[in-house]
Regions:
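Non-catalytic alpha-helical scaffolds
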Residues: 1-72, 77-360, 369, 374-379, ...
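Acidic/histidine-rich, metal-coordinating catalytic segments
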Residues: 385
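Conserved N-terminal catalytic core of the sugar/cofactor nucleotidyltransferase
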Residues: 363-364
Length: 679
C-alpha cells in the first residue's frame, strides 16, 4: 500500500529513474517536447524511438488532443520496462460529475441526443473522455466497425487487436443507455425546478437575459448538488470506471489506502507484448472503447531498446519527455502551463515542434518568450513539421521554402527583442541554421528515397546530442542593485491584478474578456479541493510566474556593472552569465508562486468555491480578488505586513539566485532587511 500523497513524477522516478541530468556524465541527453495541439510533436517522438506507425502506434496520435498525460521514453539496452501512474480517485469523481452536469444542462437546453452524449462522454477540457473507458453508444450501435480507426491515417495495415467481444459490446451499450436514461430523468426534474424558479423570479425563459440565465443555471446546479439521485449516478459511474482496473494483473498494481490504483509496472523482453500491454494506457483505438484506461493515466514512463529505424550507428542515448500540447492560444503573452515550464530545468534540449505550413503563430511565440525570459533559450531546438505542405507560387525549391519559415522565426525573434532587449534577440537568431530542422511526412515510415527528411532527422539527433557538451565556467559576474527591483515587482503585480480583475468581471482591461462563472467556480474547486493550479486556460499561478519573470528578466538584463570587466553587448558570454541567473530565478518562482497563490490559501479557495445562491458569483469574485491581493500585493500600493513580506521574499529569492548564478546583489542582506521591518 502506498501513501495517499500523490506525486506521479516522484513515483515514476522511484521505479524507473531517468538517466542524464545536470550533473550526469552518462552521455544521455534529455529532450522536452513542446508544441501546439496537432503540430506533430508525438509523431516526431515516434520517429526517434522507432515505433511502427501502422502496427505499433505508440504513443497514439490524432488531430485532436491525444497526449493527455506525461510520457517519458528512455532509449537503453535490456528489457522493455514501464511504469504508469494514475489520477487520484477524488479527481476522477469530479471529472465524472462535471461530465454528468454538462450532459444534464445540454438536455435542459434542448440539445439533440448526439450532443448530450458528447457532453457526457467528453469533458470540456478534452483531457478526460469517458468514451474510452465506458464505450460510446453511437459506435456500439453500429453493426459495421470497419471505419473505426485509431488515427487519421489513410492506410492502416495490421490493425490493433480488438479486445472487446460482441457480448461485452452489448453489456457496454446497456450500461450506457441506463446512464443516459438517468441523465434524461435528472434533466426533466431539473427543468421543472428551473421553470418554478423562473416563475418565482418573474423571468420568462424564452426571453431571459444572459444574467438571468446564469442565475437560473446556478440554481439548477445547487438543486443537483442536493439531489441524492445525482450523486448516486456519479458513484455508479465511478464504480464502473474502477472495474476497468480488473483487467490488469493485480501483482503489477499498487494502490492507495482507499484501494484506488496509484501505479502499475511491467517488464518483458518481448517487444510486441510490451507495446500491446502499454497501449492499454495510451491508446485511442476506437474499437477498444470500453476497455481503455487512457483517461485515468497521469503519466507513463517506459525504457527499452528503442531506436530510430533510419539511425545507422549505435542507438543514441536519449530521454524523451512528451506531454500535453500547449493549445491554440490567441495571444503570445499567454501563460504556459506550469506542467510545461517546471520541466524546463530537467531538459538539456527543449524541442519546439511547429507546423511549417503555419509557422510561428501565437502559441509557439509564447514558448519562445517563456524560454527567453527564463534563460533557457540556449536549449531550444526547432523542428518544423509538415514541410511538404509549404507551397506557393513564390516558393520554388527547398531553399525558398526554408527561407519562408526562417523569416517567420526571425520576425518572432525581433518582436521578442523589443520586449527583452537586443541580447535576447541575438541569442535566438544564433540558433539559425544549426538548431532548426525541417521534416516532411514523418507520420509515415520514412523510406530510403526520402533523402531530405532522413538527412534532417539524423541532423536532429546530432543537434540534440550536442546540447550535453559541457559549457565552461562563467567568466563574467553581473552586479545588480536591489533598489532597482521594486519597480519591476510593482509592474508585474499590477498587471497580474488588472488581468484577473478583467477575467473575474471586476474591472475592464483591453484584450481580457470576463470568464463564465461556471469556469471560475471550477477553477476555485481545482485550487481548493485538489490543489491543482489551473483549470483549462485559467492559470493564476502560471500568470504570476510569467509576469514576475518577465519583469525580473528585464531587470537582470541591465546589470549595474560587471566584474572583472564589461563584456560586449553581442557577447555570448554576457548572455550566458545573465541566463544562468534567470534559470535560478525561474525555478524558485515556481515554488514561491504556488506557495503564495495556492498552498497558503487552500481554505480560502474552498470557501470561494462553496458560495451558493443568488449573488454568489459576485461574492466569489470578490473573494478571489482578496486572495490574489494577499498572495501578491503591489509594493507601496497595498501597504501592510503582507506587502512587506512578499517584497522581502522576492528580494531574498533574487539574492539567492544571483549569488547561486555567480553574480552579486548590492544593498541586500537578510539581517539589514529584518532590522528595517522591526523598526
Amino acid at each position: 500500500m502506498l501513501p495517499d500523497t500523490h506525486d506521479g513524477w516522484a513515483i515514476r522516478e522511484d521505479v524507473l529513474p531517468l538517466p542524464g541530468g545536470k550533473d550526469a556524465n552518462d552521455g544521455y541527453a534529455r529532450v522536452q517536447f513542446v508544441g501546439t495541439t496537432g503540430a506533430g510533436k508525438t509523431t516526431v517522438l515516434r520517429q526517434l524511438i522507432g515505433t511502427d506507425p501502422n502496427k505499433e502506434r505508440f504513443p497514439s496520435i490524432s488531430a485532436a488532443k491525444t497526449t493527455i498525460c506525461d510520457i517519458e521514453v528512455i532509449l537503453q539496452e535490456g528489457n522493455f520496462s514501464g511504469v504508469v501512474t494514475f489520477i487520484p480517485r477524488a479527481r476522477i469523481r469530479q471529472y465524472i460529475a462535471e461530465c454528468v452536469l454538462a450532459a444534464i444542462t445540454s438536455s435542459i437546453e434542448g440539445m439533440v441526443e448526439r450532443d448530450v452524449i458528447r457532453k457526457f462522454l467528453e469533458h470540456s477540457e478534452q483531457r478526460f473522455r469517458l468514451s474510452y473507458i465506458l464505450g460510446n453508444p453511437l459506435l456500439l450501435r453500429e453493426s459495421d466497425n470497419a471505419e473505426l480507426l485509431d488515427e487519421e491515417d489513410e492506410e492502416v495495415q495490421g490493425e490493433e487487436e480488438s479486445l472487446i467481444s460482441q457480448e461485452e459490446r452489448d453489456d457496454l451499450l446497456a450500461a450506457l443507455e441506463k446512464y443516459l436514461a438517468q441523465i434524461a430523468e435528472l434533466a426533466k426534474v431539473s427543468h421543472a425546478h428551473l421553470a418554478q424558479a423562473a416563475a418565482e423570479l418573474d423571468i420568462e425563459l424564452g426571453k431571459a437575459s444572459k444574467q438571468d440565465r446564469d442565475i437560473l443555471q446556478e440554481l439548477v446546479e445547487d438543486q443537483l448538488a442536493e439531489d441524492d439521485h445525482f450523486h448516486s449516478l456519479i458513484d455508479a459511474i465511478l464504480d464502473d470506471v474502477e472495474l476497468r482496473f480488473s483487467y490488469l494483473n493485480d501483482s503489477e498494481l499498487e494502490c492507495s489506502r482507499d484501494g484506488w490504483p496509484i501505479k502499475w509496472s511491467f517488464s518483458t523482453s518481448d517487444r510486441d507484448q510490451f507495446i500491446r500491454t502499454i497501449n492499454r494506457f495510451s491508446s485511442n483505438y476506437a474499437p477498444n472503447y470500453g476497455r481503455l484506461l487512457t483517461p485515468l493515466v497521469e503519466g507513463i514512463r517506459v525504457a527499452g531498446p528503442f531506436a530510430p529505424e533510419w539511425w545507422e550507428t549505435e542507438s543514441p542515448r536519449l530521454v524523451l519527455m512528451d506531454g500535453q500540447g500547449i493549445g491554440h492560444i490567441a495571444d503570445s503573452s499567454s501563460s504556459l502551463s506550469t506542467s510545461v515550464t517546471r520541466r524546463f530545468k530537467f531538459a538539456d534540449a527543449i524541442m519546439l515542434v511547429d507546423n511549417a505550413a503555419q509557422p510561428m503563430q501565437a502559441a509557439p511565440c509564447a514558448v519562445l518568450q517563456s524560454l527567453v525570459a527564463s534563460g533557457h533559450e540556449s536549449k531550444l531546438v526547432l523542428a518544423f513539421t509538415h514541410f511538404d505542405e509549404v507551397k506557393g507560387d513564390n516558393l520554388i525549391g527547398t531553399a525558398a521554402r526554408k527561407d519562408h519559415i526562417v523569416g517567420s522565426f526571425d520576425n518572432a525573434a525581433r518582436a521578442i527583442g523589443k520586449s527583452f532587449g537586443r541580447e535576447s534577440e541575438l541569442s535566438l537568431l544564433r540558433l539559425n541554421p544549426d538548431r532548426i530542422v525541417f521534416l516532411s511526412n514523418v507520420q509515415k515510415r520514412v523510406e530510403a528515397k526520402a533523402r531530405f527528411t532522413l538527412f534532417e532527422l539524423n541532423r536532429l539527433i546530432d543537434v540534440i546530442m550536442s546540447t550535453i557538451t559541457p559549457v565552461g565556467p562563467v567568466q563574467y559576474r553581473p552586479i545588480y542593485d536591489v533598489a532597482n527591483l521594486v519597480l519591476a515587482v510593482q509592474k508585474a503585480t499590477q498587471e497580474f491584478h488588472d488581468r484577473w480583475r478583467g477575467i473575474l468581471g471586476m474591472g475592464s482591461r483591453s484584450g481580457v474578456a470576463p470568464e463564465h462563472w461556471t469556469r471560475i467556480k471550477a477553477l476555485t474547486r481545482r485550487l481548493g479541493n485538489f490543489q491543482i493550479d489551473e483549470y483549462d486556460a485559467l492559470r493564476p499561478v502560471a500568470d504570476l510566474i510569467r509576469l514576475l519573470q518577465t519583469q525580473i528578466s528585464q531587470f537582470l538584463n541591465s546589470p549595474l556593472s560587471w566584474s572583472p570587466e564589461i563584456p560586449s553587448d553581442d557577447s555570448e558570454d554576457r548572455q550566458v552569465a545573465i541566463d544562468t541567473i534567470k534559470k535560478e530565478v525561474f525555478d524558485r518562482l515556481h515554488e514561491l508562486s504556488r506557495t503564495r497563490v495556492l498552498e497558503e490559501k487552500v481554505s480560502g479557495w474552498v470557501e470561494a468555491y462553496e458560495h451558493r445562491g443568488t449573488g454568489s458569483t459576485r461574492i466569489r469574485a470578490r473573494d478571489m480578488v482578496r486572495l490574489y491581493e494577499e498572495a501578491a500585493p503591489i509594493p507601496n500600493e497595498m501597504p501592510g505586513p503582507d506587502a512587506n513580506e512578499f517584497l522581502f521574499e522576492l528580494r531574498e529569492l533574487i539574492a539567492q539566485s544571483v549569488i547561486e548564478g555567480g553574480g552579486e546583489l548590492l544593498g541586500w542582506s537578510r539581517t539589514n532587511y529584518e532590522s528595517v521591518i522591526e523598526s
